[in-house]
Amino acid sequence: PLRVALGDSLMWRKNRFATPRRTRLVEGGDELMAERAANQRPNTELLRQQALAALPGDGRLLIQADGQVKVVSPQVLGRLHIHEPSPLGDEPSPARLILPIEPPPKLLAISAGGRVAAVRWEFAGQQPGSLERFLPTGLEGDPVISIEPLPQGDCSNLSLGLLSSDGRFKRLPLSEVLDLSGRATSVVKLKEGISVRAAMICQTGSDLVLISDIGRILKLPIQDDSLPLMGRLAQGPMTMRLFPGEQLVGGVSLMATTSILIATSQGRIGRIDASLLRRCQRGDFGEMAVRLEQQNDKIQTICKGDGLVGVITSQKRHGRLDANSYPCINPGEPCSDQLDLNTNETLSNLIPLLQDNQN
């Protein structure tokens, strides 16, 4: 048959022209060659260490609200005046974080989709750029809502808190995210249409403050019986039950601060002493944080009430204010101050500045 003839012909050609094998077949040789090639390539951790060693010892890590990541000298930082109060205008984007690079800080980026990843900021010394360049590709298209510095020492009483838009709050042991690889990791299971609204480092025994757009505020103790620690696949318990049309704005973990700053869409600012708020249980009604005097004005954002706070408006104007300069009001009172906004301009966000060893 033709098949037998072709086989005999190929076998004759192999015996006539083929060269004898000069290497020895080794079981698993393909895997060994791949491992050897990988070891010869510089890995990400080695490149990160080399980039860190090339940075000046007195450098400062600067991350702005628009996502720009830079390593600058103290002299350049002083000329920018980005850590000083300023009125609304054509100012640079507010600073979100200013930290010394010695000791090297560990930064955790949390996305709206409930994923976390380490920020490889060390590469910003030679090539500054947008935050996306220093994050794994797994976060591409998933907006980062928070950047949290991880502690250097004991973190047994610390946890990562995630507040979702449906009013659920989940605490994850911080030890589970300290040693992240170069990939993004999912830390919360979200239903369709639900996103992470706020993320924060929580300390056991402190308080959590949540607020909605109508001004309803809820203060919860961060304890295992009220806000238990959960695994990565859990959604977290319901904390604030929302009325029809009511939306959750955000939350603040009160660790080293005792006051909160609240801003409305029309630019009204109120600072409240958090110790005056009563502690509640999950699902409670809570109390009214401020009295909104206009029907179309709603709570836009909340942040800690001390230190420097950046301001961003709908017309892309920027400013910086000193939260400590605002007097504290009692819960339920009108906001004490008004930002100088243009016609048809609204407040978009408040960006608290994290610097040095602030929490």
Regions found by a protein language model. Give the residues of each.
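Short, structured "edge-of-domain" segments at secondary-structure transitions
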Residues: 1-359
